[in-house]
């Protein structure tokens, strides 16, 4: 039962990371000033 809880936790964390990646890509496409630094870093991370 404990193993299932760990798997669920990992799945939720991965889903959140994917969601953040999508949000970052959207913001980068719109060229938001605040995200420009993050976008520069984001290009080096293979999403």
Swiss-Prot record:
Primary localisation category: membrane
Entry keyword set: Cell inner membrane, Cell membrane, Membrane, Transmembrane, Transmembrane helix
Protein's UniProt keywords contain Repeat: no
Membrane-spanning segments: 6-26
Source domain of life: Bacteria
Topology in membrane: Single-pass membrane protein
Cellular component, GO annotation: plasma membrane
InterPro entries in the record: MgrB
GO BP terms in the entry: negative regulation of phosphorelay signal transduction system
Subcellular location: Cell inner membrane
Quaternary structure and interacting proteins, as annotated: May form homooligomers. Probably interacts with the periplasmic domain of PhoQ.
Reported function: PhoP-regulated transcription is redox-sensitive, being activated when the periplasm becomes more reducing. MgrB acts between DsbA/DsbB and PhoP/PhoQ in this pathway. Represses PhoP/PhoQ signaling, possibly by binding to the periplasmic domain of PhoQ, altering its activity and that of downstream effector PhoP.
Similarity comment text for this entry: Belongs to the MgrB family.
Name this protein carries in UniProt: PhoP/PhoQ regulator MgrB
Organism: Escherichia coli O127:H6 (strain E2348/69 / EPEC)
Designated gene of the protein: mgrB
């Amino acid at each position: 039962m404990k193993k299932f809880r760990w798997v669920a936790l990992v799945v939720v964390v991965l889903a959140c990371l994917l969601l953040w990646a999508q949000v970052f890509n959207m913001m980068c496409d719109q060229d938001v000033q605040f995200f420009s630094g993050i976008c520069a870093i984001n290009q080096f991370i293979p999403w």
